[in-house]
Amino acid sequence: MRTFIDVLRDNAVHSDRSVTFVRAAGEERVVGYPDLWHEAQRRAHAMAAIGLQRGDRVALVLPEPDEFILTFIAALAGGFVAVPIYPPQTLAKMEAYGDTVRHVLAASGANVLITTDALRPMIEEHLVRGASTARVVVERDVRSAAGFEGQSPEPVSLDDVAFLQFTSGSTSSPKGVMVTHRNLSVNSHAIMFDGLQSTPADRGVSWLPLYHDMGLIGFVIAPLYALVQVMFLPTMAFIRRPSLWLDAIHRFRGTITFAPNFAFALATRAVTEGQARSWDLSCMRALGCGAEPIQPDVLRAFLGRFAAQGLRPESILPSYGMAEATLAITFADVTAPLRTDRIDLAAMRAGQARPSSGDGAAMELVSCGRPFPGHELAVMGPGGRPLGERQVGEVWLRGPSVTAGYYGDPAATEETFGGGWLRTGDLAYQADGELFICGRAKDLIILNGKNYYPQDIERIVSRIDGIRDGQCVAFSRFDDAGAEIAVVVAESRRNTAGLAAAIVSAVRGEL
């Protein structure tokens, strides 16, 4: 097995291969594979020149896709450990952003942070305020490598840590997942060849954030590993104007793209007939969905909305994964239409995924497919007891995509990775060998001895007239008497006095 850096070096002979960067201002920059490899070597040389040594952690806060990707690959090529940090999105939340940067720097031990001229003053201010000793270097200085004459860095080992992927921190403080070069090679190969069945004729289109594993591994590392060309769009440009995503697929003749569930809902709602009229989306063969709960109604609405543009039902490709498994764990069949399972809600709350008979409350779940070859997936009950077909339990995984644990946190590593299995914290069941995700174990709401999934409550509330689509959250807390109660927070499009009563009625009526 070769490292990603070995593969990238060998692929540099393909002068007909390139990546395209669309910057925030709209201009496009095309970088061929030979130039990509040369630039990675040059920047790795510059990083060594500023004092970085092999194994040192280096934080990256770079908003533009080309700046980030070229510097990230350079860090891997030089044997440094990259630490991606998302760039600030709004001035209104700078205090919270500063807290995040300081936490990641402290947790990773990074003593160098590379950013832009524009962001440097703000970042330095927050580091001084937090008494951080990290040195801030501008990307421009890494770009201009004095004394570089094309020399290659020392080779990296498969078991070296390539980068730290910090978790989202949705249920705890963000932790740095140690992703090795072996993890990257194994998972990239599985994604591109087992999951996507890709060839060099494929073309990827992505607006996904590059500091997140789906954007970084799924559309930088894996495609470069497999000689697949990619067009990168600025994330915020998609959020402001969703039509840019589908327009890029049309223009670039994209065959592979991925997005979270919310993006499909946003595009369905926001794209106008005038924008879509000239598109031909028949080129798209793998329209992947993951990173958050997948709603089948949203995917069907998206397919229906763009069927006239040639989008095919079998192009929808649900998947499941997490940073602790590098990226991907399961893929649905890339050649088959969407598969769903409608199950009885009462039975599921009792831990059984029984198909609905049509009577009583039910919910529809999406198949996320099967685990990759060479990996073992099991659904476990309490105490690590393997569960059978259609029994709901926690997803456990073992295999070469499972990462090396959390950097500097042996207790959390033992809790999640101990005993040879990755305990994902996700609840699911298997049916006919395929995985159906139900929710997060830590998110379960237990009322009067019954289990309720927040996603079920949120799905019901989102359908109520007056509630903004996707803008609600359900959770539990304990009241003054010590009893667990359910709480729903929802954003309304208008001030409706009876909305709270409507929410209570709808949830009680369906659950």
Where are these regions (language model features)?
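Conserved AMP-binding/adenylate-forming core of the ANL superfamily
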Residues: 19-65, 69-73, 90-99, 153-155, ...
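AMP-dependent adenylate-forming
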Residues: 6-31, 162-164, 171, 321, ...
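Conserved pre-ATP/AMP-binding loop-to-beta segment of ANL
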Residues: 17, 148-166, 172-173, 183, ...
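Conserved AMP-binding/adenylation subdomain of ANL enzymes
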Residues: 185-203, 213-255, 270-275, 376
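AMP-binding/adenylate-forming catalytic core of the ANL superfamily
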Residues: 250, 257, 399, 404-405, ...
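Flexible, low-complexity linker/hinge segments
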Residues: 1-2, 102, 139-161
